[in-house]
Amino acid sequence: MQKKLLVVVAMSALLGLSGCGLLPDKTDETAKWSAEKLYAEARGEMSSGQYAQAITLFQRLESNYPFGTYAAQAQMEIAYAHYKAQDQAQALAAVERFIKLHPNHEAVDYM
């Protein structure tokens, strides 16, 4: 009797664990967005005071389009968003990273 119970419990556990793989993974809706759309959405989040979401979108923009026209701007915006979110340490780190990556950029003096 105990052997049958053990087999039933083991089979139930296996079925339960195998079912976890059937659930769809969370998809990133921004994965197929253009650089322009990512930038516009991030700026919109900044305008509405949603700095954490803006930072996430700017980081996604920078990682998806590292050599695009918005990459350097996204880095500057990340620093500004951290500053606006009262996170001075992260803002300073973002500024230092920008200066290290773009020492001759026209906006370095304003960082």
Q: PLM features: what roles do these ranges have?
A:
Residues 29, 64-71, 99-110:
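Short solvent-exposed coil/turn linkers within tandem alpha-helical repeat scaffolds
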Residues 21-25:
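Bacterial signal peptide processing site
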Residues 16-19:
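C-terminal motif of bacterial Sec signal peptides marking the signal peptidase cleavage site
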